[in-house]
Amino acid sequence: MKNNPLDFQRATACHVLNAFRNGQRRVLVADEAGLGKTTVASEVVRQVKGLDGVLDDNIYCIVYVCCNLQIAQQNIDTLSDEGETVDLAQSRLSMQHYVYHRMKTDLLKNQKDTLVLSLTPATSFQMTFGTGSADERALIYACLTLLCEFKDGNRMTALSEMLQRDAYKGWIGVRDRYVGYVQEPDMDDYRMVIKKAMLSHLSSTYKNGKTIKDELMRLTSSEEMENRSNAGYYLIIALRKMFANISLEVLKPDLVIMDEFQKFSSLITTELNSSKDTEENMVARKFFTNRDTFILLLSATPYKPYTTIEELNENKDDEQYKDFHRLLNFLYENSEAAPDIKIIWQNYSSALPHLGNTDFGELVLKHQAAEDMLYHVMGRTERQNTGIIKEVMPDISHCLTEGDIRSYIQMQHLIDHCRSYGQSVFTAPTDYTKSAAFQLSFMENYKLKEEIQNGWKAGAKRKSKVDCLLLDKNIIENYSLSQYNNARLNFVIEDIFGDKKHPTHVEQLLWIPPSHPYYTTGESIFTRNKDFSKYLVFSSWGMVPKMLASLISYESERRLYKRAYHGATYSDDVKRLLRDDNKTKGESIFNTVSTYLSSLYEPKATYGISLAEIRESIKEKIEKRLSDMEAERTNRVSSVDIMLLMQALDNGTDTTGKIYTDAANVLADIAIASPASCLYRAFRQISKENSDLVKSLAEDAAKELVGIFNNRYGIAAVKLTCKTKDDYFLRVLEYCALGNLQATLDEFVHMIGENKPLTQVNKRIKESLVSAYPQPVGTLQGFSEDDKIRMRKHFAVDFGNTKQTEQAVTHATSVRSAFNSPFRPFLLASTSIGQEGLDFHWYCRKMIHWNLPSNPQNLEQREGRINRYKCLSVRRNIAKAFSEKFAWDEMFDEASQVLKQDYPEMVPFWFLPLDNELFRDRNDIEFIERIIPIYPMSEENERYQRLIGILSLYRLTMGQPRQEELLQLLKGKVTKEQMKELLFNLSPYSRNTK
C-alpha cells in the first residue's frame, strides 16, 4: 500500500516525470539512504500512467528489479496497489511468462490495470549453469505437455523423469500443481500465447545442426533412457534460457525500476549487441534497447563515491572515477546532449584543482554547468544530520582482560603447531582476536579454520591450549560461562545489561517500553528502562554476527535463569506454564476477546492518569455486574472459571460457574492489558465497521503473541518481574499492564501503517513474533569431528549473507520483521554486505560499528539503516515534546505545524530542529547513537578521525580522479562559504524553493 509522499518526495517524483516528458528515458533518483526512494518510485508509478502510449494494451506493467529478495519483500507492497508479496518459488526469469499472464488475468477480472513484477539477480537471472529449481522445471513440464508431441503417455513420463533431476521428494506434487495452474479455465489466452512461443523457439538450433525440439524428442524416446540424465542436464539449461527469452518477449514493461542497482551494475555495462546468452545480456537487450520503456534507477550510492589512496594503490584502478562516468554514459545514451557532457565535465574538472589560483566566479560558472548537466538526468536529496547523530566513543580499557591477550597468544601458538604438522598456515589477523570471542567456535567457510582443523587432527591438539578459542560445552551447559575474553563483547554486554553494581535487568524485557505510555505505574522494569533501544551491529567479519547472536542470547539466559531457576541447565526443558491443573490452556484467557471487558477501558479518556486509578474505576463497574450473578464464591482462582465469567459477561447471563473472590481485579486487568483486548482496540482504530472480523483477527494475532510468555525466557522474565501473585496467568496479566501493552501495540500499528488493510496489519504483527533460532557452534569437545552444539538465538540474532533459497529468504524476512517490532530480538548483527535498502529503524537508535568501514560512504549507508522515517529517536522526542496529545497522528500533525517552518517535510518525520525552544532546555532528548568501541592505543582511532574528516568533504570531489590527493590539494584553500557553493545541489525540492 502506498504512503502519501511528502513535499520533497513529490518534488523528486515531479522532476522524474518532467524528464520523461522531455524525452529522457533513463533517470536516476540518488536520494540519501533512508529518505524514501521507494515512496518516490510509487508516486512515479502512480503518475507515469498519464504519459503517452503507456496504456496502449490496457495493462500498465512495471518491472521492479532489485538486488535481493529481502528488499523485494519489503518494497513491493509500497509499489503495488494490492499489497502484493513476492513469491520466491516463481521468481525465476524463465517463469515470468506464466506469472505475467496469471497476474494480468486476475487484474482484468478485478477491473485493475497496474501489474508489478519483481526480478532479483540472485534468483531471476541464474541460468548460465545448473538446472534451476523444481518449480521452474515443473512449469517447463506443464508448458511442454500442452504440445501434441508430448501428450503421448510414455513421452510424458520420460519428460517428467528428465526434469525431475534431484527433486526426489514431492516432484509429482509440484509437477501436477503446475499442470493444474496452466490448465485453469481462465488461462486460455496464456495457453495460446505460450504454445505459439514454444513452437517458434523449439525450432532454434541446439547443437550439431539439431534443434531443441530434435533433442527433446530424442531424449524422451524409450531408447535413450540411459543417456537421459547426463544429456538432459544441458538440455534443461537450454530450455531454461528458451523460456527466459519467452518471458522477455511476453513482458512489455512500461516502466522498469532498478533499485539499489549498484549491486548489479553489470546490467548497465553489458554490451547490448553481444550474442552471449548471459542473464545480464538478455535483460539488457530487452529493457535497454526498447525506446518505449521508461527506466527509473534508484540508489543512494549509484557509483563508488570515494576511492582512498590505499584502494587506489592496491587495486591499481580508480573505481570511483570509472563508475561515475560509466553511469553518466548510460544515463545519457542515445541522447542528443551526450557529446556535450564530456566537455562540460572536463571544463569543471580541469578548473577545480586550481581553486586558489583561478577566478572563483569562473569556477562557479563551470560548476553550475556541470550541476545542470547532472540534474537533467538525476536528482539527489540529502538529509540534515546536524544534531541527529550523537557520537559515542566509549573507553573500553576497563573491559580488557587477560583473556584478550591469551586469545591472541593461543591462536598464534596453535597456528605454529599446525604448521609443524604440515599445514600451510602462518598467522591470523589480529583483528580476528579483537573482533570475536571464541573465534574458532564461530568461523564458517574460513580457509584458516580448515587448515587448523587439519593440523588439529594430525596432532596439534596435544600441544595446544585453546580454552579462549573454543567454547566448552560443559561450561555452556551449566550456565558457568561469564568470561568472554573479548573487550568489545564485554563492553556491549555491559552497555546492555549493566555492571554488577548497576544491573539494568533488561533481560526481563519482552518488548521495548512504549514511547508514549498511556498511564503511569509504579517503578518497574519498564520505567527503569524507558529509554532502552534495540542495537544494530555491523562488522567486517562473517563470524562476528553469529558470535554476538549466540553469546548475547546466552548471557541474557544466564542472567535470567540464575535468578529464576535454581540449578538450571542449558538443555533443561521448561514446562509450558500457561496451563491449570485441568490441562485447560490458560492462554485462552489472553487470546479470547471479551467485547464487554474491552469496552470498559478507553485509553484516550483515561490518558495520563495512574494504572491504579484506571483499574479501580473498571473494577467498580465489573463488581456491579458480578453482584447480580448467581454463582458460588471461591477463594481459589482458576483460568476455567475466569473464562466462563468472561463468556457470561459477554452473553449477558446471570449464571456462571464459580466466582473467584477477587475476580473483579482479574477481569479489570484483562480489560486493560490482555493481549486480545489490546489487539481488539488497536484493530478497531483501523476498522470500525466489521466488528466480527476485528474480533477474529485480534484473537488470531493474540494466539501468536501469547507465545512470548510461554517459552523459556518469557516464563523466567514474568516470574522475576511479577512476584506478588502465585498463578502464572495472573503474573502475565500484571506484566502486560506494567508494560503498557496497549500503548506498545498502538505504536506498532501506527508504524505498520493505519492506511493498510486490517488483514495485512494482522499478518505483519504475527510475522514479528518469532521463536528462538538455533546456531550450530563448534566446541572444544567436538572440534576434531566438526561436531557442533546448537545454541539458541533470541535476545540477539544475526542477519544476512544467506543463500537466496525460499527457506533462507523466509527466515531473513521474519528476522527483519521481528527486529522492526517492539518484541525480541533486541540486537541484530550483520555484515554490511547486501543490507543497502533495508530498514531497521522502528525500534533501534543505537548503531555499533564493530569494525570501521574502509569508506566514508559505507559509514553513511550503515547509519542509513536506522536514520529513517519516524525512527525511534524522532518518535520518542515527539512524544516528550507533545505529550498532551494522545494519538500518534495528532502528535505528528501538531509537530508539523509547530516545527516545520521553512524546512522540507523531513521535519518532523526524519529529524527535529533541536535548537527549538521545545527541545533546547530538555535533558532527556534521545539521539541516534554512533557507537565505536575502539581498543586503547589502537590505530582505529586515527582511522576513524580520518573517516569523519573525509565525510564532510568527499562530495566536493564527486566524479574526480584521485580524490584523496585532490582533497589534500584543496586543504586550506576552500572556505566554508565556497564549499557550500561548490557542493552539487541536485535536490528538486531545494532547487524549486530557492
Predicted regions and their residues:
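Helicase-associated low-complexity regulatory tails and linkers flanking the ATPase motor
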Residues: M1-Q24, T39-L828, S832-K994
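Hydrophobic anchor at the beta1->P-loop junction of P-loop NTPases
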Residues: V29
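ATP-binding Walker
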Residues: L35
